[in-house]
């Protein structure tokens, strides 16, 4: 049964035949737009919350570590599903493609149940471990509890969008993200500023607007998979989880989850380093993460277009197309990073002004943005290579790089530099860490090229 062949439709055919550069643009642009919209509504959340108070902004910033852990599980599982599904399509294996999709949705439900429990048990101690300010803690508790307890929409939205992206239907994935983002942006000011009552205002309102938007996006993306995606047939009658499919998903997905979890640990501990200076520094750090998402999210969107192309052509044994996809993606990533660098370098006051920055916040934030942005030019290459490792089924390389960058290098460097008593020195730890990251990325890619990509040339003629 597992050898049943897949009758590929036109979108799948073009992944193996269309010229790589226009193909990458065709698949990536919708995802880049949707990621930009995603970044926009994340920023809009903080812009509106900042108008409530700086404490509210700090509370949302402190919530980021646990919230990012939640996203890590959802996105990381989706990465595993995306890579395995696109590879199955390249191999023309219908049965495996269907089982991958069905088990991916099952894992999304399981992930939600885990964070439902965490939302009811660990949120309060999590906040009071970071701050003694009761106002900041209580605002953060209200925000994060809602985000965790009602996170089913987020997990389902992410998984369904990965299924659409893996089958090259990135425009449909973009539509579902746009729906969720637009709903969130509309509801943010309505809830946050108390138009639905004081009990639903402030950080509580921000959380409600977020989860409602996620449920809307989940509903749209699930419908699109059922009605507009003929290359996977979802049939849950008599569904039973497949240990084999889940194992294959997490062989790629677990390193991605762990890699993003490392980011949560880094953020949590960096907040502790910065809190020793002032709570305003934590708010600046939170604002930086919101702002840099405008730079990084388009690249992550391009990755969503790149990974299926690499996965498909890896399965189809077409090494030239794999290499050309990587080169094109890296060129575009560096171009995007250059634009981000220039904006952060020359307009930091304008960017911080979006968040109603006080004079104290501007004094800390302007040099922070100007220093941190130096790592952008290096990060573009690291991000593309990291996704390449995942697309080729070697996510462990991505994990090793992430751990080295954020735990082995960045945090110790930040801690040591904080001992100078000069907060500006702490921001240089990002640049130091990225230098290590990009070096490791190229070392690992050289190994991967030798072990996986080059041997494909032996079979390329027969496949083509």
Set out the residue ranges of the language-model regions.
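Short alpha-helical transmembrane segments in multi-pass integral membrane proteins
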Residues: 1-28, 85-152, 198-254, 310-375, ...
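Residue-level signal for short hydrophobic patches within transmembrane helices
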Residues: 17, 21-40, 44, 66-73, ...
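Hydrophobic transmembrane alpha-helices of multi-pass small-molecule transporters
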Residues: 69-72, 116, 184-189, 218-222, ...
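Small-residue-rich hydrophobic transmembrane alpha-helices
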Residues: 57-117, 154-173, 284-342, 346-348, ...
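Short runs within selected transmembrane alpha-helices of multi-pass transporters and secretion channels
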Residues: 78, 147-165, 173-181, 206-221, ...
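Helix-terminus/linker motif at the lipid-water interface of multi-pass membrane proteins
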Residues: 36, 40-58, 127-134, 190-201, ...
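Interfacial/gating helices of multi-pass transporter permease domains
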Residues: 48-68, 135-139, 203-205, 245-252, ...
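Transmembrane helical elements of multi-pass membrane transporters/channels
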Residues: 26-45, 146, 157, 180, ...
């Amino acid at each position: 049964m597992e050898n049943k062949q897949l009758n590929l439709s036109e979108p799948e055919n073009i992944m193996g035949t269309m010229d790589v550069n226009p193909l990458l643009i065709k698949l990536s642009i919708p995802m880049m737009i949707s990621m930009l919209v995603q970044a926009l509504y994340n920023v809009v959340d903080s812009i509106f919350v900042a108008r409530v108070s700086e404490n509210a902004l700090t509370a949302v910033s402190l919530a980021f570590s646990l919230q990012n852990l939640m996203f890590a599980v959802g996105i990381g599982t989706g990465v595993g599903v995306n890579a395995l599904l696109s590879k199955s399509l390249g191999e023309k294996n219908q049965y495996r493609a269907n089982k991958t999709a069905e088990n991916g949705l099952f894992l999304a439900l399981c992930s939600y149940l885990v964070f439902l429990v965490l939302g009811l048990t660990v949120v309060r101690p999590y906040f009071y471990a970071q701050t003694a300010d009761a106002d900041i803690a209580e605002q953060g508790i209200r925000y994060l509890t809602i985000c965790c307890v009602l996170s089913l929409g987020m997990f389902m939205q992410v998984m369904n969008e990965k299924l659409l992206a893996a089958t090259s239907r990135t425009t449909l994935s973009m539509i579902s993200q746009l729906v969720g983002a637009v709903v969130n942006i509309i509801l943010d000011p309505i809830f946050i500023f108390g138009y639905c009552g004081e009990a639903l205002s402030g950080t509580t309102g921000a959380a409600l607007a977020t989860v409602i938007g996620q449920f809307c996006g989940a509903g749209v993306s699930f419908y699109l998979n059922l009605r507009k995606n003929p290359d996977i047939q979802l049939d849950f009658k008599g569904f039973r989880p497949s240990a084999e499919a889940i194992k294959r998903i997490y062989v790629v997905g677990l390193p991605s989850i762990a890699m993003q979890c490392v980011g949560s640990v880094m953020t949590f501990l960096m907040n502790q380093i910065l809190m020793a200076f002032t709570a305003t520094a934590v708010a600046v750090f939170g604002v930086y993460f919101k702002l840099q998402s405008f730079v990084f999210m388009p690249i992550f969107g391009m990755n969503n277009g790149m990974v299926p192309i690499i996965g498909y052509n890896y399965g189809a044994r077409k090494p030239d197309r794999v290499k050309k996809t990587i080169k094109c993606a890296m060129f575009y990533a560096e171009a995007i990073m250059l634009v981000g660098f220039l904006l952060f370098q020359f307009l930091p006051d304008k960017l911080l002004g979006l968040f109603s920055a006080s004079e104290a916040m501007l004094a800390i934030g302007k040099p922070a943005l100007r220093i941190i942005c130096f790592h952008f030019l290096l990060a573009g290459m690291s991000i593309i290579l990291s996704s390449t490792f995942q697309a080729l089924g070697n996510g462990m390389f991505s994990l090793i790089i992430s751990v080295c960058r954020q735990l082995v290098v960045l945090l110790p460097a930040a801690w040591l530099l904080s001992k100078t008593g000069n907060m500006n020195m702490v921001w240089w730890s990002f640049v130091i860490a990225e230098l290590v990251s990009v070096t490791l990325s190229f070392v690992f890619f050289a190994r991967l090229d030798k072990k996986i990509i080059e041997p494909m040339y032996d079979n390329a003629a027969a496949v083509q």
